[in-house]
Amino acid sequence: MSSTVAASTMPVSVAASKKESPGRWGLGEDPTGVGPSLQCRVCGDSSSGKHYGIYACNGCSGFFKRSVRRRLIYRCQVGAGMCPVDKAHRNQCQACRLKKCLQAGMNQDAVQNERQPRSMAQVHLDAMETGSDPRSEPVVASPALAGPSPRGPTSVSATRAMGHHFMASLITAETCAKLEPEDAEENIDVTSNDPEFPASPCSLDGIHETSARLLFMAVKWAKNLPVFSNLPFRDQVILLEEAWNELFLLGAIQWSLPLDSCPLLAPPEASGSSQGRLALASAETRFLQETISRFRALAVDPTEFACLKALVLFKPETRGLKDPEHVEALQDQSQVMLSQHSKAHHPSQPVRFGKLLLLLPSLRFLTAERIELLFFRKTIGNTPMEKLLCDMFKN
């Protein structure tokens, strides 16, 4: 098992291995016997195309990109630098995986020189502003957001642009704070030092690590919302303290939808040990599984998730707010966004908007105290959740 020991320049020992012979990876026998099929030259999994100079799978290309961009240094815990790197073992030693990426011919310069992709939010916004998206509708901004403006065409266009930018900011925040199943899988394994028992999303350490990352992403999502960061700082903290548990559950549901089941709901016996983690009661597990099934049945898309998160975050009834009117305007705007997106992208489902709103009460089935106890107590100990959230938010 590997562990991250620093964030600096790429280690010389690993970088030097790039000069070694890449070996004969890349072509495997087609199970049909017709001919060779493309394989990942790093782990042997099915290749999704050329990445950074070689044929590779999404998992290995993503791992290589993150390692280079973050300038991570890994240390082989076994010490020999000869750990197996195949589809079944690729997450066991990050040092050997990175070494094999370089040996196979992946180019670090291709990562560093890669153009950052334009966010989907900006693409969507540009399309709306140029009128190239026939499905887009004029977005009505809340008066409290738009503020007083002169009558006439100018005020209409300004209102529409404000609505477009609100939607764009939601989608941008969603893109910047998205945790993929593959990301969690690869980052979880740094929490264990035992090469024989790598942490996985279903292990005890994996559950706690994934929970912490999902909470961090929820806070990051809120911080990336300009309309949220424009609120008084005290209001931001109060809203986050009020909504963190629902944002965490929404993030966990969104993360688990592509998976067969949610690893966070794994029973203690499947997690390696029940010690240190209280088990979800059977009724709680069943209810959460049913909730995830409802999200899956509706095939909730990223934009809808973003709007639902905004509705959960912007609660004007939260006690202690300095500017509840502004928060209420943001909540109204979030509903407008969700309604118009549903009509534009799912015209054959006239009741979809209502069904999406009816998903929200299920997020309050587990109290914040219960979620903290089940998923975070071992990680944070006696540290108050409010302090953890504040530290995450400030950093």
From Swiss-Prot:
Domain NR LBD: start-end pairs: 162-395
Q: Which residues cross the membrane?
A: none
Major subcellular location class: nucleus
- What subunit structure does UniProt give? Homodimer. Interacts with PIAS3; the interaction sumoylates NR2E3 and promotes repression of cone-specific gene transcription and activation of rod-specific genes. Component of a rod photoreceptor complex that includes NR2E3, NRL, CRX and NR1D1. Interacts with NR1D1. Interacts (via the DNA-binding domain) with CRX (via its DNA binding domain); the interaction represses S- and M-cone opsin expression. Interacts with SAMD7.
Q: What Gene3D superfamilies does the database record attribute to this sequence?
A: Erythroid Transcription Factor GATA-1, subunit A (3.30.50.10), Retinoid X Receptor (1.10.565.10)
Renumbered zinc finger spans (NR C4-type): 40-60, 76-101
Q: Name one Pfam family in it.
A: Hormone_recep
Enumerate the subcellular locations listed in this protein's record, separating them with semicolons: Nucleus
- Record's protein name: Photoreceptor-specific nuclear receptor
Q: Name one GO molecular function term.
A: DNA-binding transcription activator activity, RNA polymerase II-specific
Cross-link position per record: Glycyl lysine isopeptide (Lys-Gly) (interchain with G-Cter in SUMO): K178, K315, K322
Q: Which family does it belong to?
A: Belongs to the nuclear hormone receptor family. NR2 subfamily.
Q: What is the primary gene name for this protein?
A: Nr2e3
Q: Where is this region: Disordered?
A: 1-30, 127-157
Q: What function does the entry list?
A: Orphan nuclear receptor of retinal photoreceptor cells. Transcriptional factor that is an activator of rod development and repressor of cone development. Binds the promoter region of a number of rod- and cone-specific genes, including rhodopsin, M- and S-opsin and rod-specific phosphodiesterase beta subunit. Enhances rhodopsin expression. Represses M- and S-cone opsin expression.
Phenotype for K322R:
Little change in sumoylation. Completely abolishes sumoylation
Q: Could you state one GO biological process linked to this protein?
A: negative regulation of transcription by RNA polymerase II
Give expression by tissue.
Retina. Rod-specific. Expressed in the outer nuclear lyer of the mature retina.
